[in-house]
Amino acid sequence: MTSPDFQHHYVNLKGVRLHYVTLGQGRPMILIHGWPQTWYEWRRLMPLLADKFSLVAPDLRGLGDSSRPSKGYDKKTVAGDLWNLMHDHLGFERFIVVGHDWGAPTAFRLAADHPDAVTHLAMLDAPVPGDLPQGAGLGGAQRWHHLFHQVPDLPEALVYGRERLYLEWFFMAGTDQAGVFSDADIAEYVRTYSQPGAMRAGFNFYRALPQDVADNRELFATGFKLPMPTLGLGGGGSRGRADLIVQSLRRVALRASGGAIADCGHFIPEEKPEELARQLREFLA
């Protein structure tokens, strides 16, 4: 389901065509989705914030209804797309950044590269790459896919024609309560990830992790810390990573807060949109 008030747009940026959705009026905020999702993961949250915020929810390069470049899936490049969207195209001089899953490391990089423009940063259920010891945060058997998706070519070959089976497993395994995703919700995600090149693009977000780690560690070596207020939230369920995220932000930011959302798994914006909206409003007050 989508609200009739959602406005869909396309913009040609440097080397990529982005699809993005807008809703609301007020302080500008970009919502950055993760894998295996699209802008659609924010559909329940956006109406809850639209009275106070101008919300922008893009499909990241390679995903959703955006174009699928063959390269550029490191989070510094992906964050550059979003800077071009928010600052150069939409004209926002200062804005709030919220990211979930792979959107969280992208959000971190956007804030790190433009600390004077990003007023607040919220990261949902994903830590900062390069801050943790090698292998930390992968979650062992729970997050086996982090390594599998980095294998060249094989994931694409095995998943081809089985996109729904593969993606639906993550949606079911990653939630703390039954019934979060309807058949229509899953069909919308499968629609975009079944398009040519979409699964490869999604896996490329994982394959870029070594570059993300190197880029961030180069930044940390300078002593840099995020100056804006930061919020780290994780699901309190078995697949949530609340403590890991908050500890990570405390090491890389001057002002960090956060914690766990109870009875929630990985997919916070869809499992607990009302609680997420409440915590974001409190953080941004």
Where are these regions (language model features)?
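Flexible "cap/lid" subdomain of the alpha/beta-hydrolase fold that forms the substrate-access gate
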Residues: M1-H9, V16-L18, P28, V56, ...
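Short strand-coil-strand connectors
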Residues: N12-K14, H33
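Conserved HGGG/HGGXW glycine-rich cap/lid loop of the alpha/beta-hydrolase fold
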Residues: V21-D65
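A short, glycine- and basic residue-enriched loop/turn
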Residues: T38-W39, P105, C264-G265
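Surface-exposed alpha-helical interface segments used for non-catalytic interactions
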Residues: Y40-R43, P47, G80, F108, ...
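Catalytic histidine-centered segment of alpha/beta-hydrolase-like enzymes
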Residues: C264-P273, A277
